[in-house]
């Protein structure tokens, strides 16, 4: 799987999530509530987008490093495994470890964790699964140049949707 494919997929998955939380008035029952997510994007803008996209990108990349022969469903399972470990470790060490007021981004994560609970794990698993599937599909269907164009278009689109009410 090409790095540009993973990046493009992560950008478009984050775009889809942002479109969902900005357009759908009430959350889907198995996904976390959107109050803290809306605050996350409103307060931190493109830094929030960058953190989300990099988390997805690095999660898939780390899964491919840890499980070098994994492809298809195996890579999806590896990526979900890495994402779950990340989420749990991040919650226990960073979110619970830092006192309120020390880091404004982590303060929003504290609210998000309280608001979303286990549903965050489901949402993150769906997101990372979507990144793996979309990246693989892009590798099969498109040239490197086309995927690079898609990635740039994804970045461009994220800039605008980030500041959409």
Identify the function of each model-found stretch:
Residues 1-118, 129, 133-165:
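Juxtamembrane/disordered regions of integral membrane proteins
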């Amino acid at each position: 799987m090409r790095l540009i494919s993973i990046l493009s997929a992560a950008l478009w998955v984050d775009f889809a999530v942002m479109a969902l939380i900005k357009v759908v008035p009430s959350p889907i029952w198995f996904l976390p509530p959107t109050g803290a997510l809306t605050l996350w994007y409103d307060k931190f803008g493109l830094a929030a987008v960058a953190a989300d996209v990099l988390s997805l990108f690095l999660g898939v990349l780390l899964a491919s490093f840890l499980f070098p022969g994994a492809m298809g469903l195996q890579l999806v399972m590896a990526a979900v495994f890495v994402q779950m470990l990340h989420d749990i470790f991040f919650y226990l060490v960073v979110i619970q470890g830092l006192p309120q007021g020390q880091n404004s981004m982590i303060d929003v994560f504290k609210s998000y964790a309280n608001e979303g609970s286990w549903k965050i794990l489901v949402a993150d698993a769906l997101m990372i699964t979507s990144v793996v599937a979309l990246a693989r599909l892009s590798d099969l269907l498109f040239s490197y140049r086309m995927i690079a164009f898609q990635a740039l278009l994804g970045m461009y689109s994220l800039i605008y949707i980030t500041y959409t009410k």
